[in-house]
């Protein structure tokens, strides 16, 4: 699930961030991206550790571990939306708000399906690492290319289908008072 979701989001909905940035600029705002001076293999490894590995582990432990567990008595959709909203707001970027929210919903369902935050951390790492590695090797993906978007949407549809086809592992009702949480 993790790789399918990460690739689908990056390719299928990556344009959402770019579109939001264009909107902010067209309204007179400024979008400040983070420029990482990845000029050597050592720097790439260091940046992968600091900007891909650590955030993936820490954020997934918090949002899909602690937050998701604290919402275990809530119905599945409101819990997914609350967790995703917290995740999106935490990132503090207006231009990435919608993308991060959708990403958070997907990561929530990965965690619920697997019973662990680890698969979501893998997807999170893949997403963050892809940005760094593509920057390092000089690959620029045209996120507005309809073939790239279509490919990503197909991957996302496959992810949704796989998650939805077997609901037996996903709790859809609030936990009973005497029921022990997983």
Regions found by a protein language model. Name each.
Residues 58-82, 109-116:
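Membrane-interface helix/loop boundary segments of multi-pass membrane proteins
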Residues 19-22, 125-182:
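C-terminal membrane module of polytopic membrane proteins
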Residues 2-4, 45, 49, 77-85, ...:
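Hydrophobic alpha-helical transmembrane segments
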Residues 8-20, 24, 90, 110-114, ...:
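Alpha-helical membrane-inserting segments
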